[in-house]
Curated annotation (Swiss-Prot):
Transmembrane segments: none
HAMAP family assigned: MurC
Alphabetical list of SUPFAM superfamilies matching this protein: MurCD N-terminal domain (SSF51984), MurD-like peptide ligases, catalytic domain (SSF53623), MurD-like peptide ligases, peptide-binding domain (SSF53244)
Name assigned to this protein: UDP-N-acetylmuramate--L-alanine ligase
Gene3D superfamilies hit by this protein: Mur ligase, C-terminal domain, Mur-like, catalytic domain, NAD(P)-binding Rossmann-like Domain
Domain of life where this protein originates: Bacteria
Coiled coil: none
Reaction catalyzed: UDP-N-acetyl-alpha-D-muramate + L-alanine + ATP = UDP-N-acetyl-alpha-D-muramoyl-L-alanine + ADP + phosphate + H(+)
Function statement: Cell wall formation.
Lineage: Bacteria, Pseudomonadati, Pseudomonadota, Betaproteobacteria, Burkholderiales
EC number(s) stated in the UniProt entry for this protein: 6.3.2.8
GO cellular component, one term: cytoplasm
UniProt pathway annotation: Cell wall biogenesis; peptidoglycan biosynthesis
C-alpha cells in the first residue's frame, strides 16, 4: 500500500488506556512515539521499551508519523493534533484504534459504570490460567503481570469498554459483559438516563448474531434493557432467576467464599469458589468471569485456581501493608480508585467485612466538580459511613470550579449533618502528614479517589516505617 502505516504517534501516551495500546502496537512491530504533559513512571517505562517519548506537546513531535492517536482528554487545538491535520496525517481516536486491535482477534469487552477494571482483570486471569494466552488492555495495572496491557499469542483479546464518552460504541466484540448501569458521566448523554441505557443496548447490538451478552441482572437498569437485547444472554447475580447465582457468600480473612449455582441452558454442578478479593461487589465481578469461562468451556478447576490466586489490580483495594503509627502501634494502609458514591459504598463495605471491628479512616479526594455537584447528597451519606474522615479539595480533572461543589462545602455539609467531624485538607500535598497525625494503632486507612491522591500512599510509606509490606506482584499472567 502506498500509505502503509508504520509509525504511530500517541498524544497523551501517559494515560492508562493509551499506554497499553501503544505497547501492544509496539509489540506488533510498529514504530511508536508519544507525548504527555508531564513526566511519569508510565512514560519512563515506555521509553525503556524503546518508545520515543516527549514531555510536553509540540508540533514537531508528529514528524514522520503515519497516524496520530488521541484520547478524549486531548483538546482539538493541541499543537500536535493541529500539525497532524495540517499535514493530512490521520488523527485516530483511542477507541477506534482499540477497535482495530480487536479485529485481529476474538474480542471480549467488559462494560458497565463500575467494576470494569477488576472484571477485565479477572477474565484475563482466567483465560491465562487456562493456557489461552490472551491479549488484554486494562484500565489499571494487573499486579500479577505488572502491566496494564499485553500482546498474547492466543485467539482472544479482553478489553475495557468505556461508556464515559460513548467510545464503547466503536467496539464490536463477540462476547460482552455489562456489570451495571449507573448515572455517571451524564454530560455525555445530555443528562438523560434513558439515553445512557440505550447506549448500552446499542453497544450490545454491535456484536454479531453469534455473540453472547453476559449481564448482571441484579442491577435494575440492566434488567430494564434485557427486553431490548436481541442476542443470547447469560445472566448472573445474587438474586433468584440469575442463570449463574452466588449463594452462601461469606467473607473470610480478606477473601470471599461462595458457591455458584449454574443454570444457563444446561444444568452444571455447583461450584465452590474462593476469591482472593474482598467485598460482595467483587463476587459479582467474579461471577461474570465465571460466565465467560462457561461460554468458553474452561474447566472448573482452572477457574477456581485463577480466582483463588488472583493478585489484584493496582489501586483497586490495594493493600500497601502494615505501617507504623505515631502512637507506636501499626495501621493497615489501603489504596482504592473509587470516586463515585456507589463504588465508595461497596469498597467501604468490603473494608468492614475484611477488617471487622476496626476503626476505618477514609482519606478521600473528590473527583470532578460536576460529579461532586450531581452526587452531593450521596457523597454525604457514604462518607459518613467511615469512623474518621480526611477530606481533600476536589480534583478538578480539567473542570472549572463550581460554586458549592468544592471540598470545603462538602466538609461543612458533613458537619451540619452531625454524622462525622471531617478534617479538611486543602492541599493534597498535606494529606500524607494528615494521615500520619490521625492514624492510630489498629486503624484501617483507606485512601480513595481517581485524582492525585493516588500518589499519597507511597508518600505515607516514605514518612513512616513499614512494619509489614504486602507484596504487589506474584505468579500469574
Amino acid at each position: 500500500m502506498k500509505h502503509a502505516i508504520k509509525h504511530i504517534h500517541f498524544v497523551g501516551v501517559g494515560g492508562v488506556g493509551m499506554s497499553g495500546i501503544a505497547e501492544i502496537l509496539l509489540n506488533l512491530g510498529y514504530t511508536i512515539s508519544g507525548s504527555d504533559l508531564a513526566d511519569s513512571a508510565t512514560l519512563q517505562r515506555l521509553a525503556s521499551l524503546g518508545i520515543q517519548t516527549y514531555v510536553g506537546h509540540e508540533a514537531a513531535h508528529v514528524a514522520g508519523a503515519d497516524a496520530v492517536v488521541t484520547s478524549t482528554a486531548v483538546q482539538a487545538d493541541n499543537p500536535e493534533v493541529l500539525s497532524a491535520r495540517e499535514k493530512h496525517i490521520p488523527v485516530v481516536p483511542r477507541a477506534v484504534m482499540l477497535a482495530e486491535l480487536m479485529r485481529l482477534k476474538t474480542g471480549i469487552a467488559i462494560a458497565g459504570t463500575h467494576g470494569k477494571t477488576t472484571t477485565t482483570s479477572l477474565v484475563a486471569s482466567v483465560l491465562a490460567e487456562a493456557g489461552l494466552d490472551p491479549t488484554f488492555v486494562i484500565g489499571g495495572r494487573l499486579n500479577s503481570a505488572g502491566v496494564n496491557a499485553r500482546l498474547g499469542q492466543g485467539d482472544y483479546i479482553v478489553v475495557e469498554a468505556d461508556e464515559s464518552d460513548a467510545s464503547f460504541l466503536n467496539l464490536s466484540p463477540v462476547m460482552a459483559v455489562v456489570t451495571n448501569i449507573d448515572a455517571d458521566h451524564m454530560e455525555t448523554y445530555g443528562h438523560d438516563f434513558g439515553r445512557l441505557k440505550q447506549a448500552f443496548v446499542d453497544f450490545l447490538h454491535r456484536m454479531p448474531f453469534y455473540g453472547t451478552a453476559i449481564l448482571c441482572t441484579d442491577d435494575p437498569a440492566v434488567r430494564d434493557i434485557v427486553p431490548q437485547v436481541t442476542c443470547p444472554i447469560s445472566s448472573y447475580g445474587f438474586e433468584e432467576g440469575a442463570e449463574l447465582r452466588a449463594v452462601n457468600v461469606r467473607a473470610v480473612d480478606g477473601q470471599m467464599h461462595f458457591t455458584v449455582q449454574r443454570r444457563n441452558g444446561v444444568v452444571l454442578p455447583d461450584l465452590d469458589v474462593v476469591l482472593n478479593l474482598a467485598g460482595r461487589h467483587n463476587v459479582l465481578n467474579a461471577l461474570s468471569a465465571i460466565a465467560v469461562a462457561v461460554e468458553l468451556n474452561i474447566a472448573d478447576a482452572v477457574v477456581q485456581k485463577a480466582l483463588a490466586g488472583f493478585k489484584g489490580v493496582g489501586r483497586r483495594f490495594q493493600r500497601y501493608g502494615e505501617v507504623r503509627a505515631q502512637d507506636g502501634g501499626t495501621f493497615t494502609l489501603i489504596d482504592d480508585y473509587g470516586h463515585h458514591p456507589v463504588e465508595m459504598a461497596a469498597t467501604l463495605a468490603a473494608a468492614r467485612g475484611a477488617f471487622p471491628g476496626r476503626r476505618l479512616v477514609l482519606a478521600f479526594q473528590p473527583h470532578r466538580f460536576t460529579r461532586t455537584r450531581d452526587c452531593f447528597e450521596d457523597f454525604i451519606k457514604v462518607i459518613a459511613q467511615a469512623d474518621a474522615v480526611l477530606l481533600a479539595e476536589v480534583y478538578g480533572a480539567g473542570e472549572a470550579p463550581i460554586v458549592a461543589a468544592d471540598g470545603r462545602t462538602l466538609a461543612r455539609a458533613l458537619r451540619v449533618a452531625g454524622r462525622i467531624e471531617p478534617v479538611f485538607v486543602d492541599d493534597i500535598a498535606a494529606m500524607p502528614q494528615a494521615i500520619a497525625d490521625n492514624a492510630r494503632d489498629g486503624d484501617v486507612v483507606l485512601c480513595m479517589g481517581a485524582g492525585s491522591i493516588g500518589a499519597v500512599p507511597a508518600k505515607v510509606l516514605e514518612m513512616l516505617q513499614i512494619s509489614e509490606l504486602i507484596p504487589q506482584g506474584g505468579r500469574g499472567l
